[in-house]
Swiss-Prot record:
Biotechnology: Phomoidrides A and B (also known as CP-225,917 and CP-263,114) are potent inhibitors of Ras farnesyltransferase and squalene synthase. CP-225,917 and CP-263,114 inhibit Ras farnesyl transferase from rat brain with IC(50) values of 6 uM and 20 uoM, respectively. CP-225,917 inhibits squalene synthase with an IC(50) value of 43 uM and CP-263,114 with an IC(50) of 160 uM.
This protein's encoding gene: tstE
Catalytic activity: phomoidride A + S-adenosyl-L-methionine = (-)-phomoidride B + methanol + S-adenosyl-L-homocysteine + H(+)
Protein name: O-methyltransferase tstE
Species per Swiss-Prot/TrEMBL record: Talaromyces stipitatus (strain ATCC 10500 / CBS 375.48 / QM 6759 / NRRL 1006) (Penicillium stipitatum)
Pathway assigned to this chain's UniProt record: Secondary metabolite biosynthesis
Molecular function GO labels: methyltransferase activity
InterPro entries listed in its UniProt record: Meroterpenoid_MTases (IPR051654), Methyltransf_25 (IPR041698), SAM-dependent_MTases_sf (IPR029063)
Length: 296
């Protein structure tokens, strides 16, 4: 059975309060219908790994999604974005599988949501005991067991934690032990300064050796800069390829480390196209940034 480390945070314990409006199902980022195109290759995982009958897959996903919506109404939850896997479409995925299948290397998905990328790795032959997931919301990771029907067989470790809480004892346990980190739809949640803090924490998790790497994908912008967050306080920084590399130059200087940074600016996918109706959340300049940051 999977191990779970729980850390209660202030943001988790607060009630919906000022963000109660976001939990309503008439917002632009809550999609009522679910198409086969959206399910994509996740259907194979749900049918073959989770043993869910084909005719039950759509209803199963929608019920789990609505349960997750009550935990926190992220756009990736409302728009079924969690069904779109990131890592299989990265140039490094074959390398990642080869390294993890040996059983000698460890992986963590930071901001793992339901742990869908972890299930894909297991589906593709990676030993689950060497895989870790981390998310602010314990509820999402619990719901992951409901989505994939695997609480009794998955041996991965899940950690509920605030990435900015460096005093978390769970961080000390994994410090310097991780070979590969995935961060999908994560960095774009924060300001430039907070992204730097996140990166430094990620460096702390990674083995301090050549080849340790971070991969992921997040929203970017052809006009990089801090973007407003409708209905919420603060702003988040959206990168283009150049600013993403510049940030990692800064991180390298401040941590006395060196990194090879590869980044691809990709055209809109369905999720971001639909997101245009969010106003400031997404615009015609929104792009996806797919990246690999490898320690030299």
């Amino acid at each position: 059975m999977a191990a779970v480390t729980t850390t209660e945070t202030a943001s988790q314990s607060r009630d919906k309060g000022e963000n109660a409006w976001a939990y309503k199902k008439d917002v632009a980022w809550y999609r009522k219908d679910l198409s086969e195109d959206t399910i994509g290759e996740t259907r194979a995982i749900l049918q073959q790994y989770s043993k869910i009958p084909p005719e039950r897959v759509i209803d199963h996903i929608k019920k789990v999604r609505d349960k997750a919506w009550e935990v926190y109404p992220y756009g990736s939850v409302g728009m079924f974005g969690f069904l779109t896997l990131n890592m299989p479409y990265m140039p490094e995925y074959v390398e990642i599988l080869d390294r993890l299948r040996t059983g000698d290397q460890k992986f963590i998905d930071v901001g793992c949501c339901f742990g869908q990328e972890i299930r894909k790795l297991v589906f593709d032959g990676v030993p689950s005991q060497n895989l870790y997931g981390m998310d602010l919301h314990q509820g999402f990771m619990d719901i992951g067991y409901d989505l994939f029907c695997d609480k009794q067989k998955l041996k991965s470790t899940f950690i509920a934690a605030d990435i900015f809480d460096s005093s978390n004892p769970a961080f000390a346990k994994i410090a310097g032990t991780i070979d590969i980190i995935h961060a999908g739809s994560f960095f774009h949640l924060f300001s430039w300064d907070d992204q730097v803090k996140v990166a430094k924490q990620i460096i702390n998790f990674l083995k301090p050796q050549s080849g340790s790497m971070l991969v992921g994908k997040h929203a970017g912008d052809t006009n990089p800069g801090h973007k407003s967050r409708p209905g919420r306080l603060g702003s988040r920084y959206r990168h283009n390829g150049e600013t993403w590399k510049k940030m990692w130059e800064q991180i390298g200087e401040e941590t006395d480390t060196k990194w090879e940074v590869k980044v691809n600016e990709l055209a809109d996918d369905e999720y971001f196209k639909d997101g245009k109706q969010y106003g400031d959340w997404d615009s015609e300049t929104t792009r996806r940034l797919q990246f690999c940051v490898r320690r030299l």
